[in-house]
Amino acid sequence: QNFGGYAREAYVASKALVGKPNKQNSKFIMFGRGRSGSTLLTSMLNQSKLVNFDKEIYNRSVLFPRQFLKNRSAIYSGDVYGFKLLSYQLRNQFGVEDGKVFLNELVQDQGYKLIYMKRENLVKQTLSKHYARFRGSWHESKKVNRTKMIVSIQDFIHELNEGRKLDFLEEDVLVGIPNFEVIYERDLEENDAKIKLMLNICEFLEIPTFRPEIKLEKISSKQVADYIDNWSELEQAIGKTKFSNFLADIE
């Protein structure tokens, strides 16, 4: 995977070298974690003719991450350039301390705006990740027939602990950095909330407002037992951990 990242880095550098660099009027980072609604928000933002939203550019290691970002933004057209950065990618590519410096450089020195994606219920977020991995599909554009899965309780508890570590990391690296916070449960579960969110984000990014078409469907049911075959056993196991407080919001 590292070789693929280095090859992509070299390709982007060559394109930036021979092409005329594009200068955007606005730039932003979408920062957070998987299963926080970032793909849904990306699909809505990309419906603006002004926005050119790049992907997770650090999902593979690169040798010169700061220059890589400059090259990526240089080859993208459009008035607004954005890219997605997951917190584990920041940790893996930069380390925590340099990750803080990197985010500060982007926001304070280079004029990037930061959209912070988060989810209040860590258990629901982890369930969603497990089910997406099981189905081999992270997002759907139409309704689907759902099949059930059996979750490894030990693996699930381990992922909850890893998720808590990322909670602390995100809190740490964002200290002192202005950001627009998007909470999945508040802003992305209902269509009316999504429309309101888009109006506020357009204002934050200083672009004309628009009404997006909602194209993606949730792949998991609201009833956990509909897609987790051993939910009763998993629920009991979670209830004996420090994550038991998240169970109150789960149907």
Locate each region found by the language model.
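The conserved 3'-phosphoadenosine-5'-phosphosulfate
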Residues: S61-L63, K148, V173-N245
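PAPS-dependent sulfotransferase catalytic domain
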Residues: S87-N179, D187-L188, D192-F210
